[in-house]
Amino acid sequence: MRSVGRSVFSSGLIIILLCISVVLGYATDMLITRVEKYIYPTDFSKQITACAENYDLDPHIVYAMVKELSNFSSNRISDDGRIGLMQLSEETFLWLTDEQLGEHLDPGLLYDPTTNIRYGCYYLLYLTTRYDSWETVYAAYLSDPILVDKWLTETPTEQEFVIPNEEISQKTIKIQRTVDKYKKLYQEKGDVVS
């Protein structure tokens, strides 16, 4: 009789431990997801979503660019003088505003998140019409399309293109990993970025 009681007690204990294990696993998964969403935020979502939609870009790409280039700091100035969330140079901004869109805006507007995101997205769109792969688009955005064109002349096809600059190559890899992370965090479970 005693062994039956122990058997029932052991079975009950195992079931309780399994339930606790499942709950802890679920809670851990939720905590990890929350931490990852903190690390990979969706700040400026209204502007990013609107511009991505307007320029037919995947918003995850725009979030990844902002995350990797400025870490969502609209006042960020890089060592080479690029400004704002999407790290545009004054020269690129003036070329976009004057020659591409005919708007003739002051470069001081690069600090404005809405303006910076809009022109960063437009520049990405421009580069997607010029190049066939996102790796090449990122390389051109990070360096200069003229330099990337030169690199491409040294490669038989764009599909075989290997970025010869190690720093640019590493940054493009990092951006693509961040794009993948945003897609995983904000799209997998129907939680689309908006």
Language model: regions and residue ranges:
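N-terminal Lys/Arg-rich, disordered targeting/topogenic segments
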Residues: M1-V8
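Hydrophobic membrane-insertion alpha-helices, especially the h-region
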Residues: S10-D29
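Catalytic glycan-binding domains that act on GlcNAc-containing polysaccharides
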Residues: A27-S194
